[in-house]
């Protein structure tokens, strides 16, 4: 049996896998434990690459367990904020591994953490899973920031209760809006190292000015929300832009970078079922 967690976001999917104990024992120490693969949804072959990734894992499992590759079974949990991408992926997985696969979407009802908001079923499952995974790993109270397409800043009480939070546009969404809403401003590539560096002073060209403005807006919003939520809390930052945001925050925020909390939460969920 292979446990698979798939975090379907708006710009990428993260696939985390955990093989059986016997398979783990047969692997080199450096490759043991959960394996994570991130695939961009902009890649037209993203579904194919996801299936190929699982097939490669099946070959390793089959070799360790002396069985046919086709008989390797998968237990899959999907957390999605993007149904338009998640549904065709699940259909393709069922077709590729129909003999031995179980796929289930994760909902707020799967989260053991109490959810103290007006409409729990409307909260993004990524926010809930990230908050629960952070609570399992760090001292509460917690402020959990997920820096992706959007940036969410959520509060978990000392008792481990999800209290809600704030949502704002992410780095790429902000710069895309600047480029789309003006004639002269370019679209930035936040994946490049240069874009991810926080300028040390006023921007001396257009790109530097955009970088400074967007990074300062997100980092400044997080700092402001820390004050609004009040009290001392552990700050945990996850998501694709976690590293960039942590670098932009002042040292006194003492932010902890955990880039793959949602994927880790999916494995936690399966292990505790």
UniProtKB/Swiss-Prot annotation:
Its main location: cytoplasm. It catalyses: (R)-pantothenate + ATP = (R)-4'-phosphopantothenate + ADP + H(+). A monovalent cation. Ammonium or potassium. Keywords: ATP-binding, Coenzyme A biosynthesis, Cytoplasm, Kinase, Metal-binding, Nucleotide-binding, Potassium, Transferase. InterPro entries: ATPase_NBD, Type_III_PanK. Its cofactor is NH4(+); K(+). It holds the Pfam family Pan_kinase. It is found in: Cytoplasm. The active site is at 126 (proton acceptor). One of its GO terms (cellular component) is cytoplasm. ATP binds at residues 7-14, 149. Catalyzes the phosphorylation of pantothenate (Pan), the first step in CoA biosynthesis. Homodimer. NCBIfam families: baf (TIGR00671). Belongs to the type III pantothenate kinase family. This is Type III pantothenate kinase. The lineage of its organism: Bacteria, Pseudomonadati, Planctomycetota, Planctomycetia, Pirellulales.
